[in-house]
Amino acid sequence: MRHRKSGRQLNRNSSHRQAMFRNMACSIVRHEIIKTTVAKAKELRRVVEPLITLAKVDSVANRRLAFARTRDAEVVGKLFTELGPRFQERPGGYTRILKCGLRTGDKAPMAYIELVGRPEAAEAVEVEAAE
């Protein structure tokens, strides 16, 4: 029985799943938007949002926790210098999932997962409005 088991298996063993979400979390922190399947995007929220919450308080202990979860010093630096201060007043909900159709090969539902309030999105809207 699977009582009280949370999270999706995604047809992977636990170490593969953990490595995949660690890599995806690093990618979304670096690029602030990535394209993936809807199921992976929904699970990725559970990894990324606590990292950003951790980054709101810049301390050595929090940086070490973030590094233990991402294993990437560049990502930890961006979390604590850019993303933590950006989301300081927001009490959660740092990501947005936008569905974008089906994948060509296998018709898997795809989605963009992005960080809310990313600067590129605001600039793109202003450019389109000006045209």
Curated annotation (Swiss-Prot):
Domain of life: Bacteria
InterPro entries assigned to the protein according to its UniProt record, in alphabetical order: Ribosomal_bL17, Ribosomal_bL17_CS, Ribosomal_bL17_sf
One GO MF term attached to the UniProt entry: structural constituent of ribosome
PROSITE patterns in UniProt: RIBOSOMAL_L17 (PS01167)
A Gene Ontology cellular-component term: cytosolic large ribosomal subunit
UniProt-listed Pfam families: Ribosomal_L17
Biological process, per Gene Ontology: translation
Family to which this protein belongs: Belongs to the bacterial ribosomal protein bL17 family.
Subunit structure: Part of the 50S ribosomal subunit. Contacts protein L32.
Name by which UniProt lists this protein: Large ribosomal subunit protein bL17
Gene name, Swiss-Prot/TrEMBL: rplQ
